[in-house]
Amino acid sequence: MILGQTLYEIFKNSFVMVLLLFASIAALTLIIERWWYFAKNRLSSKWVKEFFSYLRNGDWEGARRYAAGLKSPLGRLFLLGLENRNLAPDELSNLFYGQILEERIKYERYLGGMGTLANGATLLGLLGTVVGLIKAFHNIAITGSGGPAVVSRGIAEALLTTAFGLFIGIPTLFFYNYFTKKASDISLELEGIGERLIVALYAHRQETPKEETRREERKEYWQF
């Protein structure tokens, strides 16, 4: 019971509350979906170290298999670099820029809708309050009766929609800002990893046959 009314009566008497209910369901759905996507497509420094260890040993096939097994934006960036490692650094940088932009779009998917729901829920709550106040004063004018207690009750019922709208809007806005910042941070991290990969690939291309032979000998020595 809220203000002497059941939830059914509250939603039955206010179309704005019904709209807010649907908004809350939509917002919760988007938050859960984005949380799952970010968790599934996270970045790990362990993966970066492991991949670059393959490059240091000159194990291209091992690096390719490892990158393909990641099934993440990091793995897709690594594969793109390996498949185009013979390109000039500037060309490879442009490829990485396009790939990272594509990944960022995926991370930011549905965030526009989440932001709209956060602001829309608050405004809907205010609309419900205004409509409720109009109805309360209109009923008082028609009946010709109503003391402070009656007016206060009508205002309290009208303000309920504002409270519900804020209850939806504030958490949704928090998650919107969190996911937006997270998407930006991941994009910057991918850019940094991409730069490191370009340097590593270019360094391997500059090795002379004699240097490659010495590296193979060192690898065999340590394996022994």
Residue ranges of each PLM-predicted region?
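Residue-level signature of catalytic and energy-coupling elements of molecular machines
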Residues: 14, 28, 63, 78, ...
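Hydrophobic membrane-targeting segments
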Residues: 1-49
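Alpha-helical membrane-interface segments at transmembrane helix boundaries
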Residues: 4-16, 97-121, 148-160
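Lipid-exposed faces of alpha-helical membrane segments in multi-pass integral membrane proteins
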Residues: 19-32, 117, 121-127, 164, ...
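Hydrophobic membrane-targeting alpha-helices
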Residues: 31-34, 139, 175
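Hydrophobic alpha-helical transmembrane segments of polytopic membrane proteins
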Residues: 156-174
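Predominantly long cytosolic amphipathic alpha-helical stalk/bundle segments
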Residues: 42-127, 131-145, 177-224
